[in-house]
């Protein structure tokens, strides 16, 4: 006997439908665990708003009511991200025959102001990089991570996920698995290469304490000692050394990635080249950094032009 589509007599719970959708994304697109969990959270929040009712019974009016309820406390960027997740979910449900129509079809993204990434000056970056105590193994690890991120522009998740096999020290290149499981080759400079060699020649083994792993950057914290650094751990590293360097401006885990892109553009790098280095699928994402670079050029003009 043919089974009726879910959402009409709902033989499958909404929890299971979210799981099935997440499994499909993982199998077909190889999205990262962090991305998949973010999708799950957004869908579960919609379920909570609907008091646990099946998402397959959700109509356009229900979605409009959800976004209206969220409007006062949610940024446009967050609302648009959630709408993107919902559109993907309902397109999947339609494709699988679970619903007859896509309730997101007529919904449009909210207008949002251009958010320019916060960046550090070159002097601030130098102070940040010099902050770790490199007479210790932990300090060498931290200095190496900071140097490599500034030299390569990696995402934090890409940095902490690096394996020793991803390193090409002979030609100073990293093999990185980025968003959507897309692999790219990322060059880095001689200074970062020297710190990597110093870290690998002694500090890493000291931190591992006899353990074996192919994770490049390892932690010494409690029960996780000898395992890979997490994004949260690296964020704590950045905040710790920013404080030591006297940096009081607002920071984010990607501060050095933003500085990498901005400083390249300030020194005349081609926008397309920066796009490839950052691993952006769309150049419009990279274009945001040109606004930071223009601000810097305007400051230089005002400071040095005789009629500035």
Where would I find each of the regions flagged by the language model?
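Conserved catalytic core of the tyrosine transesterase superfamily
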Residues: 1-308
């Amino acid at each position: 006997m043919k089974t009726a589509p879910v959402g009409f007599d709902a033989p499958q719970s909404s929890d299971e439908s979210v799981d099935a959708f997440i499994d499909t994304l993982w199998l077909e697109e190889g999205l990262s665990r962090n991305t998949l969990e973010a999708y799950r959270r957004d869908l579960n929040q919609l379920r909570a708003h609907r008091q646990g009712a099946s998402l397959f019974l959700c109509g356009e009016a229900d979605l409009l009511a959800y976004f209206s309820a969220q409007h006062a406390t949610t940024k446009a960027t967050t609302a648009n991200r959630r709408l993107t997740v919902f559109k993907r979910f309902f397109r999947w449900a339609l494709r699988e025959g679970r619903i007859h129509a896509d309730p997101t079809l007529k919904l449009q993204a909210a207008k949002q102001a251009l958010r320019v990434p916060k960046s550090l000056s070159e002097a601030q970056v130098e102070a940040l990089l010099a902050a770790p105590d490199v007479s210790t193994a932990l300090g060498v690890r931290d200095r190496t991570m900071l140097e490599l991120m500034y030299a390569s522009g990696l995402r934090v998740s890409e940095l902490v996920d690096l394996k020793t096999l991803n390193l090409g020290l002979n030609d100073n290149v990293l093999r990185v698995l980025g968003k959507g499981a897309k692999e790219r080759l990322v060059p880095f400079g001689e200074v970062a290469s020297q710190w990597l060699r110093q870290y690998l020649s002694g500090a890493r083994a000291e931190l591992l304490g006899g353990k074996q792993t192919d994770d490049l950057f390892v932690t010494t914290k409690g029960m996780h000692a000898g395992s890979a650094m997490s994004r949260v751990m690296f964020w704590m590293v950045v905040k710790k050394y920013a404080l030591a360097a006297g940096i009081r401006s607002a920071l984010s885990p990607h501060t050095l990635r933003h500085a990498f892109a901005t400083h390249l553009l300030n020194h005349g790098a081609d926008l397309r080249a920066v796009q490839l280095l950052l691993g952006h699928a769309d150049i419009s994402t990279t274009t945001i950094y040109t606004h930071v670079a223009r601000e810097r050029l305007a400051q230089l003009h005002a400071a040095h032009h005789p009629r500035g």
